[in-house]
């Protein structure tokens, strides 16, 4: 029986641990805090699950597969995780990323509709399409209860035989030290999220930023799944209908300030709140002046081109590094775990797109660059 240590029980690490133990591996899952904890990027209330990824058929297929696996996890665990609200994309131009997304979605057989701006009124109780060229609607997309999903993944992994260890992990060559206990396995995967770059300074190049989210009090009729989740691609704002009474979520999607996940307070920016409010007033007029009922800040960890990091350690052949998923982790986590399992079992070859080498700056939280077709 092959053995693995997975460090980090977020969506990447937890999904991999569950995948491996379900496939007959002996698995130890290490996490410094309880799964779904508020310090992590995987600890939020909701995450968009959608397949549109511009011209990238690889990411589109991965996201579609991940949704299948989330639904499978629901059936196996009995948990209610995915909310089929649909996702509406707002575009101000007829070509570019939106047009490429529509083309690839249709090629991959993913349901998608191209709507005129005025048709947004059938999706939302109050909608102003001023400045939009079109709406791209993914009816089978939706929202995942992220914190719940993270917890369920770890619970299922333990139920299937994984050992869960709580503590601070330190790399020691091809072993792991957890609060003085030395752990060994055939494969070690470090999936430390916002902490990964600090664990491997000089090897892992990730920028960690603080991303702020705002929840507004909305009248009846704005609940998810009654209204679709939404993304204004050119405006750089996204949101989710009121899920589980938390409030109507709206957040600017621009990269936030650099952030230390251990030392800094998680206090949302007043400037970003004003941007969110301005957008609500523009696009959903009835929500202008809606009261702020909640906030959250979470760390994002991003590579320079926003593709994932999936690479062997340059000095230790049994050690792998997995990260750079913030903004995309839940869209791909279970499917990426399948890919990583293939790498660990030497059934797949590492792809330089996800490697440790230099990457061109650019990309964006919504539109990763990728050369793999």
Protein language model annotation of sequence segments:
Residues 46-123, 236:
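Dinucleotide-binding Rossmann-like beta1-alpha1 core, especially the glycine-rich loop
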Residues 72, 90-166, 172, 302:
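Flavin (FAD/FMN) cofactor-binding and adjacent substrate-gating region
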Residues 171-183:
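Conserved beta-strand-loop-beta-strand element in the redox core of flavoprotein oxidoreductases
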Residues 2-29:
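N-terminal Rossmann-like FAD-binding beta1-loop-alpha1 element of flavoenzymes
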Residues 22-42:
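Glycine-rich FAD pyrophosphate-binding loop
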Residues 284-373:
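C-terminal catalytic lobe of FAD-dependent flavoproteins
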Residues 15, 50, 57, 181-293, ...:
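Flavin-dependent oxidoreductases
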């Amino acid at each position: 029986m092959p053995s693995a240590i997975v460090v980090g029980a977020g969506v990447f690490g937890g999904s991999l641990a569950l995948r491996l133990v379900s496939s007959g591996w002996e698995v130890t899952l290490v996490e410094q805090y309880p799964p779904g904890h508020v310090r992590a990027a995987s600890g939020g209330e909701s995450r968009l699950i959608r397949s549109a990824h511009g011209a990238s058929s690889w990411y589109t297929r991965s996201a579609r597969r991940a949704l299948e696996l989330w639904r499978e996890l629901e059936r196996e665990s009995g948990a209610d995780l995915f909310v089929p609200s649909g996702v509406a994309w707002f575009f101000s131009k007829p070509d570019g990323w939106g047009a490429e997304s529509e083309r690839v979605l249709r090629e991959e057989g993913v349901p998608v509709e191209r709507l005129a701006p005025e048709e947004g009124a059938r999706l939302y109780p109050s909608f102003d399409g001023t400045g939009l060229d079109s709406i791209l609607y993914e009816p089978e997309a939706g929202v995942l209860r992220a914190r719940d999903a993270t917890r369920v993944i770890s619970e299922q992994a333990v139920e299937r035989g994984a050992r869960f260890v709580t503590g601070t992990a330190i790399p020691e060559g091809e072993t792991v030290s957890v609060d003085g206990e030395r752990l060994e396995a055939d494969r070690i995967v470090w999936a430390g999220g916002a902490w990964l770059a600090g664990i491997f300074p000089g090897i892992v190049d990730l920028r960690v930023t603080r991303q702020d989210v705002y929840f507004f009090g909305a009248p009846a009729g704005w609940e998810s799944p009654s209204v679709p989740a939404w993304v204004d691609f050119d405006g750089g704002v996204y949101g989710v209908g009121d899920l589980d009474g938390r409030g109507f979520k709206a957040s600017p999607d621009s990269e936030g300030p650099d952030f230390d996940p251990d030392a800094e307070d998680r206090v949302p920016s007043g400037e970003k709140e004003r941007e969110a409010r301005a957008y609500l007033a523009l696009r959903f007029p009835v929500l202008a002046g809606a009261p702020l009922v909640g906030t959250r800040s979470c760390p994002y960890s991003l590579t320079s081109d926003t593709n994932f990091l999936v690479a062997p350690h340059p000095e230790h052949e049994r050690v792998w590094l997995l990260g750079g998923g913030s903004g995309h982790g839940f869209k791909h986590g279970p499917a990426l775990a399948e890919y990583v399992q293939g790498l660990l079992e030497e059934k797949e070859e590492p792809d330089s797109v996800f490697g440790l080498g230099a990457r061109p700056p650019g990309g964006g939280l919504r539109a990763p660059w990728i050369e793999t077709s």
